[in-house]
């Protein structure tokens, strides 16, 4: 199973949704499913699903459909969920704590190794057995513990400094919840989650009916 060159980001962003729905099917003891049945559950067309999956190999069988468990495992492999990723959270406020307590975090392979904050009153407090540390220790911690992913949950004014420390420590990917577009080297991957932008999109949809 080899990924073809030139896979669009739109395809990549649909894979986690396939993975999530396939997990639900397995939990409901569904062994196989057609692209048509999958399209009815997910909301994409059957043709779109087939095209997306064909970017990575031949998974279905004519007249049979897809083996749910096999497809789930294959998509997990494509997404890189076959190994663990050492992860840190920066910002132990509401968002940071919610992410640290997210039940699927560990199951998906994201191993929380450290939580950092600038507030001295937070130092030493544990969240899921991980002690909150001084953010000034972040760069060295990333270097010494082979941290690959940093999750930024700090205010906009502090986010770029945190990002710089992560990059200097050798981070490979950043999940950014701060309302800022971070400046990073080209080889650092950043996935932004701008909550206010998502809310503004929702407000638009509430007030307009012109979206296809």
From Swiss-Prot:
Organism of this sequence: Clostridium perfringens (strain 13 / Type A)
UniProt-listed NCBIfam families: PRK05472.1-3, PRK05472.1-4, PRK05472.2-2, PRK05472.2-3, PRK05472.2-4, PRK05472.2-5
DNA-binding region extent: 17-56
Protein name per UniProt: Redox-sensing transcriptional repressor Rex
Major location (coarse): cytoplasm
Recorded name of the encoding gene: rex
Entry's Gene Ontology molecular function annotations: DNA binding; DNA-binding transcription factor activity
Cell compartment(s), UniProt: Cytoplasm
Binding site for NAD(+): 91-96
